[in-house]
Regions:
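Surface-exposed interaction regions enriched in Ser/Thr/Asp/Glu
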Residues: 426-433, 717-758, 831-847
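Hydrophobic or amphipathic alpha-helical targeting/insertion segments
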Residues: 247, 253-305
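Beta-sheet-dominated scaffold domains
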Residues: 450, 491-696, 701
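Acidic, small/polar residue-enriched beta-strand/turn segments
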Residues: 383-428
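Extended, beta-strand-rich, solvent-exposed assembly scaffolds of outer structural proteins
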Residues: 101-106, 110-148, 156-165, 170-171, ...
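Disordered, acidic Ser/Thr/Pro-rich linker "stalks" and the adjacent N-terminal cap
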Residues: 42, 54-55, 59-110, 124-128, ...
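Short beta-strand-plus-loop segments that form exposed binding edges in beta-rich domains
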Residues: 174-182, 829-833
Length: 849
């Protein structure tokens, strides 16, 4: 029997589609695998265990406002506290002084109920400041405990949403403390309690960076906006909930939440979606935020001319041609009309004596007015209503409430006068392009000092750009270079805008094609929107990856790279996922982790509609482009990168109940949804999120090497904690507790040359196999544990002894007789326990038939 050797030292092409099993003619076949599950590609060529995830928090479900009985023992009108109207407020009448407790308002729910939030609306002090106000709860109206502290109050009204998360019947807002506040009283417009409902909606995660060391994760849910700060504390990343905000929308569905888009400049985030556009501002500290509607001015107008359009009212102005001296109007005299700063062409007076002269003068006035850019294509009518008197009626698409017209003579006697009077003010049929009637913007970004809005619900193919340097002003009247722009894509097919991206040009992704604004600079008179490619994109927000813009095609089946080509002098779109198309399944979200402090890879995390995830490892300069799959005990729903930390939301079934968690990708975690904690008297708590679930336990970061990296027994969480077996209790040791996952690598079917040709489809046998590994332990081949021969001084450890499970770098040597004879005898490499795994190279000795 002929024997050959085959070495695979690169895995940078990742997992290949089953459709490529026969493509032994391409280089990618020999640097790829058939299965790459729960692993990631290392840019240097190997594959390693994917990161685990740290549990951050459970996502907020829907919330509903309660209607307790209110009392205000220190004066005030309690009926306004839950009316939902921030414009009506009430004030206490008793001075605060040194009263402790000073109860502003008390709420009685009649029975004990679990409350999630309390809203304080437009609360202020009449004088002074205080940080001693608390929200408290009680089950008996006698003994109260703190549920939340109110941030510093002053004389300016403020809004707060506080997380209370307690079950009680009685709740109160009170000053707790003895600081003398003198004659100060409290004014408040709203005090509302909210209970969490069972409505589960996928949140939208976005990042917001205010300074180099201040990075926030913003979570949008159906009734809440939660803000978390991610920061390095010591050697660990710490993610802390710092604020909750009542949004200016309510009751969003999962689909509506998914459509949220944001753009950020300095400490301001602009938010658009299926609601009135909002502005979120950080005021300097983690807990100090302000949310309001974006203060747009001069919103672009459009005449939709349908059943929803306003009924227009005609504008009527009367023009009279007169004179002050002896100079009479003569045929051939000329004049121009000024309409709100815009001049008409020169109008010729044709006389006013005969019917023909009168008709000709009327025609000249009407024609030149209609051609003015301030009017539409139709709607200007002129009639002669007296001697040298002409009534101008503006109707239909042209009407609005105009300023009084004016005019001046360009040719004729200096005695001529032209007077105007307004007899009726008009109102237009045109209306704001975005509004509660017409819907709101779909996408948003900044480009060349302008705010760009890509499509609205009613103008899906239009681009709107603000005035230069004035992001909220969309004044387009004069068409000056710095004024706003309103442009519409015109092509042979429907091109609804789904995203806009500010690259080397403004890139516009639509449902039918990809476009770019190629004019430099972009002005109202020069804007050019040119088609580039015609794939079409779905609604997933595009990502800038390694110098190209990655988007998902409109069918949700491929990942495309939008990249400028100097040879074409245009953008081209290449299919990045053609070799792993089976891993792209209607993506709903994606985010780029562009290298970290410990890794130089670019990982694009793609969330599929079926709850699986796909990771693209890419480094264009090194021709690295490989996909691996991510599977967990649950469904991944959304993803976001904050600075160099990747967060995801995962829907898990815990004790038969569906829950949504925010989790953080971290290579120092070896399990999913896990926590790191210490044991106290053999008990590890903080596991409420996994109550009723079976979890694995791993020792981590022990002060003695003997306590590091042991995989302990499985336990079932009860009442948010587990009790360790006495034999598994270690002092000075951190434990990781979470849900296990299994990394799996299965190489492509072997193809070697045995002299008579390629043998991929022939019977063969792997008689020996060696693996080079890095910092690994607990590796199994076809379900059988194999030892690592560690590099080091001779005789320090036996290569055949399990011994310590501290990760080792070395060779798994002389694995014999893999799977017997067959055509596809490739082994499966796994790591069933939560231990490190990093494969660098595989060597086969193959015997062929």
């Amino acid at each position: 029997m002929a024997k050959t050797r085959f070495i695979q030292s690169s895995f940078v092409s990742g997992e290949l589609s089953p459709l490529l099993k026969g493509r032994i003619d391409i280089n990618q076949y020999y640097q790829a695998v058939e299965t790459a599950e729960n692993v990631v590609i290392v840019p240097q060529g190997g594959m390693r265990r994917r990161p685990g995830t740290e549990f951050i928090t459970e996502c907020v479900k829907g919330i509903s406002k309660k209607s307790p009985t209110y009392t205000m023992p220190n004066g005030g009108t309690s009926s306004v506290l839950n009316d939902g109207d921030d414009t009506t407020s009430t004030s206490t009448t008793t001075p605060i002084g040194t009263t402790d407790p000073y109860v502003v308002a008390k709420m009685d729910l009649l029975v004990d109920l679990p409350m999630k939030f309390i809203d304080l609306r437009q609360i202020s002090l009449s004088t002074g400041t205080s940080s001693q106000f608390k929200v408290q709860y009680s089950t008996d109206d006698v003994t109260y405990a703190d549920a939340a502290s109110v941030p510093l109050l002053g004389t300016n009204p403020q809004n707060f949403r506080l997380l209370v998360d307690h079950t009680a019947r009685y709740w109160r807002l009170a000053r707790i403390g003895a600081t003398d506040l003198g004659a100060a009283t409290v004014t408040i417009a709203g005090l509302s309690l909210y209970e969490e409902s069972a409505i589960l909606s996928t949140p939208r995660l976005v990042d917001m960076s205010v300074e180099d060391d201040r990075h926030y994760l913003v979570e949008f849910t159906r009734d809440n906006i939660a803000i978390f700060r991610s920061q390095l504390v010591g050697i660990n990343i710490q993610t802390t909930r710092v604020a909750d905000i009542k949004p200016l929308y309510s009751g969003l569905t999962s689909a509506e939440i998914e459509n949220i888009r944001v753009a950020q400049v300095e400490n301001v985030m602009l938010i658009v979606g299926d609601f009135a556009p909002m502005r979120l501002v950080n005021l300097g500290t983690d807990s100090d935020w302000f949310l309001d509607l974006i203060p747009f001015t001069n919103v672009p107008q459009y005449d939709f001319d349908d059943a929803l359009s306003p009924i227009p009212v005609d504008e009527i102005q009367v023009m009279t041609l007169g004179h002050t001296g002896s100079g009479q109007w003569k045929r051939g005299d000329r004049f121009e009309i000024d309409v709100e700063g815009v001049l008409s062409k020169s109008i010729s007076f044709a006389g006013d004596s005969t019917p023909d002269e009168q008709a000709s003068t009327v025609f000249n006035i009407q024609k030149n007015l209609q051609e003015m850019p301030v009017f539409g294509e139709t709607g200007v009518a002129v009639t002669r209503t007296g001697t040298k008197q002409y009534t101008i009626t503006i109707s239909g698409e042209s009407t609005k409430d105009f300023e009084l017209f004016s005019a001046y003579v360009t040719e004729g006697s200096t005695d001529h006068e032209i007077d105007f009077t307004k007899t009726q003010s008009g109102s237009p049929r045109k209306e704001d392009v975005w509004s509660s009637t017409r819907g709101y913007p779909n996408s948003i970004c900044f480009y060349e000092g302008r705010l760009v809005i890509g499509g609205t619900e009613s103008k899906t193919q239009s681009i709107f750009m603000s005035k230069t340097g004035s992001f909220f002003d969309f004044d387009i009247d004069d068409g000056d270079d710095d004024e706003a722009i309103f442009a519409t894509i015109s092509s042979r097919k429907l091109n609804d805008i789904v995203d806009v991206y500010p690259g080397r040009n403004l890139q516009i992704f639509t449902s039918g094609a990809e476009f770019a604004v190629t004019s430099k600079p972009t002005t109202p008179s020069s804007i050019t929107i040119q088609p580039q490619t015609s794939h079409g994109a779905n609604k997933v927000e595009v990502q800038d990856v390694d110098g190209s813009t990655i988007f998902v095609d409109r069918h949700g089946k491929s990942l495309l790279s939008f990249l400028y080509s100097f040879n074409e002098d245009a953008y081209t779109s290449d299919d990045r996922s053609v070799l792993a198309s089976h891993l792209i399944n209607q993506p709903v979200d994606m985010a780029l982790l562009a290298g970290t402090a410990s890794d130089d890879a670019n990982w694009l995390f793609i969330v599929n509609t079926d709850g699986t995830a796909t990771i693209l490892n890419t480094l264009r300069s090194q021709d690295i482009n490989g996909f691996t799959s991510w599977k967990t005990d649950g469904d991944v729903k959304s993803v976001c990168v904050v600075d160099d930390q990747l967060f995801m939301t995962v829907e898990r079934t815990v004790n038969s109940v569906k829950k949504l968690f925010i989790e953080r990708w971290d290579f120092t975690y070896l399990m999913d949804c896990s926590i790191k904690s210490v044991q106290v008297a053999g008990v590890i708590d903080g596991l409420d999120h996994l109550d009723g679930e079976s979890v694995k336990v791993l020792t981590r970061d022990g002060q003695a090497d003997a306590n590091e990296g042991y995989v302990l027994s499985s336990y079932t969480v009860a009442s948010g904690e587990i009790t360790l077996d006495p034999s598994e209790v270690y002092s000075f040791t951190t434990y990781e507790v979470g849900l296990p996952f299994v990394p799996t690598i299965k190489p492509m079917p072997l193809n070697t040359n045995i002299g008579s040709g390629q043998n991929q489809m022939r019977l063969k046998k792997i008689v020996r196999m060696n693996l080079r590994v890095y910092e690994s332990s607990g590796i199994h081949i076809d379900g059988i544990a194999v030892p690592v021969r560690e590099f080091g001084e001779a005789g320090t450890t036996s290569p055949l002894t399990g011994g310590s499970i501290i990760p080792k770098t070395g060779i798994i040597e002389d694995v014999y007789d893999i799977n017997g004879w067959g055509r596809e005898v490739i082994p499966t490499i796994t790591c069933p326990d939560p231990t490190p795994m990093h494969i660098q190279m595989i060597e086969y000795e193959v015997e062929g038939n």
